[in-house]
Amino acid sequence: MTKSAKIGVLLANLGTPDSPTPKSISRYLWQFLTDPRVVDLPRCKWYPLLKAIILPLRSKRIAKNYQAIWTEQGSPLLAISRQQKDALQAYLDTQNINAQVEIAMTYGNPSIQSAVKNLLKNQVERIIVLPLYPQYSSSTTGAVFDAFANALKEERGLVPFDFIHSYHIDENYINALANSIKVRLKSDEFLLFSYHGIPLRYEKMGDYYREHCKQTTIAVVNKLGLTENQWGMTFQSRFGREEWLQPYTDKFLESAATQNIQKIAVICPGFSVDCLETIEEIDKENRENFLKNGGQSYQYIPALNVEHAHIEMMGKLILEKLA
């Protein structure tokens, strides 16, 4: 391809607080938990509960977790996202694509709104939105679409855009996952695929996230040639009292040893960037959970982050839209 009209690329992810303090985290959680895509309870009931109980308690507890993983460059999610941006920009440059890549967060900073403004200020003639959620869910990819649409509402001129809905069975994505696992998985380890959960009620309302997770898992399992007793699939990070997608990751790990699973490797294919939910919850809390309940060894297989195959996959998704 030759250089022509300038395109804008939005690498969209969930977001992060600006600092690991209760105040900053409370502000971030308010934005996150008041999005009806995430929590669809009646506002008259949800908001008072959120303000009076949930935010004060969760902000203090989560602050300690963030402080344990915070870096000089900010949260791991933000630091790695910046690296992804630079790497994707470099890849597109090698493909002779006239592009400007921006990272954009649904909640927190840099916001999707500010990223869109940056692109339009630099006179891009087309925008490609890539939510870094391989498996579609209304509460993640759907929320990115809402935020992007709201950002465009403020503009009189509507530039053409493409929105990448999902890539859960994209060949390059599956190969990147399989290769990442292959170089780390030991022959005697059980492989657990852990995905972020959603309320079961959302699935009953039409969200097909679980099916996307299954399709990703089966594609990777087939690529690796694993047998039925060598792998499992669970869902993590639930909160609140209602039922979420099951089986739950923490409950599975508590009882794994009783199922003769002594050595385990956990991968989280739905996370494109390592963050609080993988570093603290999976690599620390669930490691402790598994080992204290009779497990012998536990390894967390990192997110694809800035692996070359991951960046190349992103680039090829962009190139497909330009073909």
From Swiss-Prot:
Origin organism lineage: Bacteria, Pseudomonadati, Pseudomonadota, Gammaproteobacteria, Pasteurellales
Pfam family for this entry, one: Ferrochelatase
Species assigned in the record: Haemophilus influenzae (strain PittEE)
Family: Belongs to the ferrochelatase family.
Official protein name in the record: Ferrochelatase
GO cellular component, one term: cytoplasm
UniProt subcellular location: Cytoplasm
Enzyme Commission identifier(s): 4.98.1.1
Domain of life where this protein originates: Bacteria
Gene3D superfamilies from the UniProt entry: 3.40.50.1400
InterPro entries attached to this UniProt entry: Ferrochelatase, Ferrochelatase_AS, Ferrochelatase_C, Ferrochelatase_N
Major subcellular site: cytoplasm
Keyword Ribonucleoprotein: no
Chain residues that bind Fe cation: H196, E277
Keyword Metal-binding recorded: yes
SUPFAM superfamilies named among the record's database cross-references: Chelatase (SSF53800)
BP GO annotations: heme biosynthetic process
Function: Catalyzes the ferrous insertion into protoporphyrin IX.
Keywords: Cytoplasm, Heme biosynthesis, Iron, Lyase, Metal-binding, Porphyrin biosynthesis
